[in-house]
Amino acid sequence: MGSCSPQLPLICLSDQTLKPGSSKWVKVRSDVRKALEDYGCFEAKIDQVSMELQGSVLKAMQELFALPTEAKQRNVCPKPFAGYFSHNGLSESFGIKDANILEKAHEFTQQLWPEGNKSIKMIQLYAEKLAELDMMVRRLILESYGIEYFIDEHLNSTYYRMRLMKYIARPDNDITAAVGANVDNGANDNADGDANVNDDGASIGVKVNVDVGDDVNDNDSVNIGVGVDINVETNVNGHLDAEANGDATAWVVGAVSGNASVGAKEANVDAELGLPSHTDKSLSGIIYQHQIDGLEVKTKEGKWIRVKPAPNTVIFIAGDALCALMNGRIPSPYHRVRVTEKKKTRYAAALFSNPKEGYIIDSPKELVDEKHPRAFKPFDFVDLFNFYHTEAGRRAPSTLQAFCGVSAGK
Ligand SMILES: O=C(O)CCC(=O)C(=O)O
Ligand SMILES: [Fe+2]
């Protein structure tokens, strides 16, 4: 309240009043289209998920992440990175395919708790509610472009995957100073997903963490801003590994690293990022951040909007597959996670919708006209995802553009 920091559009999708065909529905439909065309995402106020269910899901997540590593690693998926994944000690996540369907979600229980566990029921119920919400939003989108005939085919061509995330709390006993580091301009620069910085050289913010121990200095006010020689390896943008099903994330493997010398003491240079900037590969994602903020979304103007968590609020975000399907009319925004609160563990849950394997994504002809010439060639989502794992896919400023952009000339 009263804050002038930029915010995402907030749209009320509350069940009580939103009935198809009602005047509220028509208004929400145009709000959804406008928000997505402008930002590729919006905040949604919802009442479909009770506080009780939210609490149960949080408890289930805490229980899951507290399992011994060997148990967590049983959450495997034939595709790499789609199961349990630990990212440089900064975050860890589980993946649950078809989390909204009870029988399928039970496969996840089998992996982690062969003796059975009631938590999965809560997670499944939660996924079911978010899936209903997601389908409503995708229905609103297609209606808003006047392609109602396509709704059933579209909804039937997709499935869901849930991702549960824990961002590990940073300790409190370090001194930090923000510094800017310029890395060479080149193909790798935009492995952080930032396609807009190519011409100016990519500037990345890195954080110098100095562990002030007795052996270094008793004085906590060490001035590390002076004489710190930062050597940030350009492998900051080493390579990105996408989630195997392509639904969501590009993780940087081998994050920002380098050394800074402070007197005789070595300090680690590390990204503050819990999750580097990326676009989701999915059609859509619904993200719920529990109490601790961290999610930031990039606007078309290149500004980062930090999304504040609220109990009955989720974020709807468009992915590359939706961008392609909608002939580029809806962008898939870059977003990242920066957990700035110390000593606080951040939990987040996201439900992604993906096109089924074998389904060809092709913009309906109604979305193509003189003002909007066809932007992408038809493709199978699996192929987009596989391309993402190639060197060329990783280096591309925009995976989607490089893979199937009409201007890519392939
Ligand atoms: O943790 C979050 O808030 C977002 C996670 C995310 O962007 C992803 O999993 O693709
Ligand atoms: Fe994401």
From Swiss-Prot:
Cofactor(s) demanded: Fe(2+)
Annotated transmembrane regions: none
Cofactor remark from the record: Binds 1 Fe(2+) ion per subunit.
Protein name listed in UniProt: 2-oxoglutarate-dependent dioxygenase AOP3
PANTHER family referenced in this protein's UniProt entry, alphabetically: 2-OXOGLUTARATE (2OG) AND FE(II)-DEPENDENT OXYGENASE SUPERFAMILY PROTEIN-RELATED
Family listed: Belongs to the iron/ascorbate-dependent oxidoreductase family.
Free-text function comment from the UniProt entry: 2-oxoglutarate-dependent dioxygenase involved in glucosinolates biosynthesis. Catalyzes the conversion of methylsulfinylalkyl glucosinolates to hydroxyalkyl glucosinolates.
Organism: Arabidopsis thaliana
A GO molecular function held by the record: dioxygenase activity
Residue sites binding Fe cation per the record: 278, 280, 335
Residues given in the record as 2-oxoglutarate binding sites: 346
Gene name of this polypeptide: AOP3
Disulfide cysteine pairs (residue numbers): none
Pfam families referenced in this protein's UniProt entry, alphabetically: 2OG-FeII_Oxy, DIOX_N
Protein keywords: Dioxygenase, Iron, Metal-binding, Oxidoreductase
EC number(s) given by UniProt: 1.14.11.-
UniProt domain Fe2OG dioxygenase: residue ranges: 258-355
